[in-house]
Amino acid sequence: MKRYSFQDTVMVVNGVEITGWADGDDVIDIERRNDSITDKMGADGGMMISVGTDKSGSVKVKLMQTSPSNAFLTGIMSLQEASGSLFVPVFVKFQDTYRQDLAIGTQGYLKKPAKLTRGAQGNTQEWEIVVERLDLAFGLV
């Protein structure tokens, strides 16, 4: 029998663990932005493939509005939006410590501040980090 628990997952941004996750089955969404390999079919039915060099990726996280990680990510966003040479690149590491799934994103940026929604109930804040290079390795268990 195989098992999974979100308690075995760790997400770190610039060395700080992200906490205060929202509910749902998609609170962490990590993917490459483009296909690694594309193909073209010739008029004679032969196929040619092209192996791309674009390894950029997207890392989306959904947090509760009460998550302390919102303040941390807002601080990075503020530094990135400031003029001058204060730009802070974002580095991301995700790991499932049980299965050993691993995603490492380097030289990234926060795409925009999280949307601010408030009402009678608590809400979710979603952040997207775009990285220049995203390396993925899937489970050993």
Per-segment meaning from a language model:
Residues M1-E31, A137-V141:
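Polar/acidic, low-complexity leader/linker segments enriched in S/T/G and N/D
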Residues Q7, D26-I28, I37, D44-G45, ...:
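A generic structural signal for short beta-strands and their flanking turns/coil linkers
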Residues G15, G45-G46, R99-Q100:
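Detector for glycine-centered tight turns/loop "hinges" at secondary-structure junctions
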Residues A22, R32-S36, K55, L63-S67, ...:
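Generic secondary-structure microfeatures
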Residues I30-R32, F91-L140:
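Short beta-strand and beta-hairpin "edge-sheet" elements
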Residues A43-S50, T74-Q80:
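Short secondary-structure capping micro-motifs at structural edges
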Residues M48-A71, Q121-L136:
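Oligomerization/assembly interface segments of phage tail-like spikes and tubes
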Residues P68-G105:
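Mid-chain, well-packed structural core segment of small domains
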